[in-house]
């Protein structure tokens, strides 16, 4: 089914937690991903969101929409610290409870539980130990891979793990790195191809298939402060 067949309103997750409503900017981000997924067959997305604007809730709603519309059966959510994995599980454990979310570091001791879960939360470090991601999963095990703090997880060894998985990729970050904006790539590739390659490897927008400086959806700190219905109460 189209991703947009699963309609999104502010009440989308209320049945799991009556005190939680989606804000309009979260609904807009969810719908822009669905529009590009359905209409443009896009499979890479970058969501720029200021700190404190509800990234985890947005991710839970994203995952729920992919699972309920049958556009994903298994989802990997990558964070860069175990504390974040635990915090994420607190929210996922409520909204995604029907899908048996697990923390990879704990669940890998029980392979059946790990392989049977629809939602796996993992630190990039735990996936990288002894290249576990290659030994325990196939490239197509996860239909959806979401990267929290995406500007960090595309560097060095971490990049290998993220690129290994072939599912739809969504990156979230408050601080995307733009190394290709206002760069004449045609000129640079002739003058210094290695410099261009270095910029491409470090550019968050490029990694997630977006034009330089243009994420799939943006709700930065300026938007948050100006928004009368936003998360910041001044």
Task: Label each region the model flagged.
Residues 1-74, 83, 87-98, 116-119, ...:
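ATP-dependent helicase/translocase motor core
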Residues 22, 77, 147:
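Conserved SAM-binding loop
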Residues 50-52, 80-82, 150, 174-175:
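An acidic- and aromatic-residue-enriched active-site/binding cleft used to recognize and process polar
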Residues 79-82, 103-112, 124-129:
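Conserved helicase motor
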